[in-house]
């Protein structure tokens, strides 16, 4: 089983993330940021990843530290769970629509962190959630999971739909990249022979 639990404590946040990459999509979230919980549930369900996230943060200031640090901790847990990456597909991609919105996410479990994020939300906030924090979440994830991630919202005029298509596509792309490829059994999917340097 490809599982990991990571706890990260700072003066700003206390976070524990547990995940199972070979799960059934069960999500449990206690972060104090309801819309982020809703989005992470999309990752779990569409990625078929069992994901448990508990966070206490300085929400009396705003959600910035909590959202960013959850991304960091999720990235650390993912890197631990995926291991040496032998026998996996490595690359994943997904297009996901929701009514008028359409997003594309492409991921490479390359060992090199990089985020290309092209999203123009039609509103600055979804409820009380500042949409700028999604970029912080994905930056945190990418920098600590050591993956290359391209996120493009291709169209949409409802910000909730824009965000939801991104997170659903991210879950599906992640699922594809993590899948075992029987023809690559025991082989690292790189001409370098490694994805860790």
Curated annotation (Swiss-Prot):
Subcellular location: Cytoplasm
Gene3D superfamilies xrefs: Imidazole glycerol phosphate dehydratase, domain 1 (3.30.230.40)
Domain of life: Bacteria
InterPro entries registered for this protein in UniProt: IGPD_sf, ImidazoleglycerolP_deHydtase, ImidazoleglycerP_deHydtase_CS, Ribosomal_Su5_D2-typ_SF
Known catalytic reactions: D-erythro-1-(imidazol-4-yl)glycerol 3-phosphate = 3-(imidazol-4-yl)-2-oxopropyl phosphate + H2O
A biological-process GO annotation: L-histidine biosynthetic process
GO cellular component, one term: cytoplasm
Pathway: Amino-acid biosynthesis; L-histidine biosynthesis; L-histidine from 5-phospho-alpha-D-ribose 1-diphosphate: step 6/9
Gene Ontology MF term list: imidazoleglycerol-phosphate dehydratase activity
Entry keyword set: Amino-acid biosynthesis, Cytoplasm, Histidine biosynthesis, Lyase
E.C. number: 4.2.1.19
Statement: the UniProt record of this protein carries the keyword Lyase: yes
Residues forming coiled coils: none
Record-stated family: Belongs to the imidazoleglycerol-phosphate dehydratase family.
HAMAP family named in the record: HisB
Name of the featured protein: Imidazoleglycerol-phosphate dehydratase
Chain's gene name: hisB
